[in-house]
Amino acid sequence: MSKILTTASGAPVADNQNSRSAGPRGPLLLDDFHLIEKLAHFNRENIPERRVHAKGSGAYGTFTVTRDITGYTSAKLFEQVGKQTETFLRFSTVGGERGSADTERDPRGFAVKFYTEEGNWDIVGNNTPVFFIRDPLKFPDFIHTQKRHPQSNLKNAQIFWDSWSHSPEALHQVTILFSDRGIPDGYRHMHGFGSHTYSLINAQGERTWVKWHFKTQQGIKNLAPADAARLAGTDPDYAQRDLFEAIERGDYPRWTVCIQVMSEAEAASRDENPFDVTKTWSQKDYPLIEVGVLELNRNPLNYFAEVEQAAFGPSNMVPGVGLSPDRMLQGRVFAYADAHRYRVGTNHQQLPVNAPRCPVNSYQRDGSMATGSYGSAPNYEPNSYAAAPKQSPRHAEPALALNGSADRYDHREDADYYSHAGALFRLMSDEQKALLISNIAGTMAGVSENVIQRQLQYFFKADPAYGEGIAKGLGINLA
């Protein structure tokens, strides 16, 4: 027997085909509450799209510990080899709108939510180990260059190359973006990275700096520019389709989860800033340590409820993991949580996809769409109620040693913008170098001469062959 159709308030609907009217040809009636409710709700079905990472795909899965790292962290999800934790992972493009193609040249978001017994822990990463900028003060400016021109409403190569030519620290990420890895073949065939430096804290209160890596077990596959352009027209949801259908047929994608670790003493003695997200840590000096396996094995039942409303943020942490002085990371701690409060709502953590799987006891109350609000329990602290939530000093992080005066320090005092990009270029095969040069020259064609000349010097500083290749691709005579 089928269910009875109801209004949102549960009243049975007698007729869902015809509006109430004054006679068969007369005007409609305002007392048709079913019509009014249906139209009013339809007008409000959409929520604001994400300012970045608007186009995305998601799936549930598990994280399984394969190596004991309790020497580094007291987080309970790592307490035993073989332990499994439920996860939700959202992939995305960065600059495109919600209806943009999955095959655009763009970094990919790689955001993982771990539903642990101590709360939700999020690693909000990308498919690249670095980023374009170091300071969050420049993030709105940077994102504006990745969006549409304010007059023409078109994507504009002039503005993003102009921005990069004034931001030489972007060169490392630009080199990755225009390499063969700039257009992954779907989401299953790419690595993920936490990108930032984070911290792990063990039971003795000792802090270790860490970088997170997610190595695809499906193998790296990328799309040639011509294939990506074709798919953008014939199957713009290519990556979404590939991920969804693979999971539906039981071909579950997996990633090997690894860390790099650095002691506080090592970090303090390094000339290079270990908290600079435009640079990587040498895997020769800081080798990858396998930690576990991440597997995606269940598709969401409702895209809007579980993917569109999913809210990730680096402020979501659990005991045993922490942040670092990485400037971009610290900016994101505020920006992401604030974006969710605007986009999804004050109580976005109460939605099923965002809700912790452990008890939540706080003094936060009310707000739009609040559920429960802890009944008659006190809404202030400290209080005299024995059963009310109390702070837990044993979960305090160890003190972080700092030095220096409060000021606006010039992050460009570290002017080594080129060595990492140059090293990456020299690691590439001749075929990969040719593709990189072709991709860059193709997008720079038509950009103003002053921008080209300013950017060109960065390529030369990274590696003379890099600069010569771009110059030749642009038809610039260096003689």
Swiss-Prot record:
Residues 1-21, 361-376 have a biased composition (Polar residues). It is an enzyme of class 1 (oxidoreductase). CDD domains: catalase_clade_3. Disruption phenotype: Loss of catalase activity, loss of growth on 5 mM H(2)O(2). It comes from the Bacteria. The active site is at 53, 126. Activated by peroxide. Its cofactor is heme. GO terms for biological process: hydrogen peroxide catabolic process; response to hydrogen peroxide. GO terms for molecular function: catalase activity; heme binding; metal ion binding. SMART domains: Catalase. Belongs to the catalase family. This is Catalase A. The lineage of its organism: Bacteria, Pseudomonadati, Pseudomonadota, Gammaproteobacteria, Pseudomonadales.
